[in-house]
Amino acid sequence: MKSDQQRWDERFRKEGFSLGKEANSFLRKNIHLLPRGKALDIAAGEGRNAVTMALYGYDVDAVDVSPVGLKKARMLAREMGVRIHPLVADLDTFELEKEQYDLIANFYYLSRKLIPKMKKGLRKGGRIIFETYVVDQRDLRTGGPRHLKYFLKHNELLRLFRGFRILFYREGIFREGGRKKAVASLIAEKI
């Protein structure tokens, strides 16, 4: 059985960028709601979101299990004329220092064990932007993880960020990039 790193390295070795170079649409549409400063991109992959945040003036740490993906992220940053700080780490054991970031971005990666660490790593007044699949995605069969543990239950994302000020939340089936996706999307502020 392949490790997570082997699996993602294999995917990212393919020519081009697996998800393209343009940032996640939820990030692009809502970046104006996010505080400037130090940012962390969780499961950064090939860097499309990290590079976009850097273009908007963020000092970005991009963490991912795949050194191959992060090498492409550095290349993309160079191409776009910005810098990011790639960090190769297993997110199952990744630790964040207390109140280290003004913004933490998490797109299409779900580790419930990481969420308390994300909360700890966010400064007061800092924000989380988070989007990932909900259980309805399995019925759509338009992509996403295979295992149920990688899907949010209905309203679970709201519960996971209880105690934060919810600035934006949506959950449902949306058409993006020519296909339907069942997602939960959240922007929340640490109070």
Question: Which residues does each predicted region cover?
Answer:
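Conserved class I S-adenosyl-L-methionine
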Residues: 1-34, 37-45
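Conserved SAM/SAH-binding beta-strand->alpha-helix loop
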Residues: 66-68
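Conserved SAM-binding strand-loop segment of SAM-dependent methyltransferases
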Residues: 80-91
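A short acidic, Gly/Pro-enriched loop at the edge of an enzyme's catalytic core
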Residues: 94-103
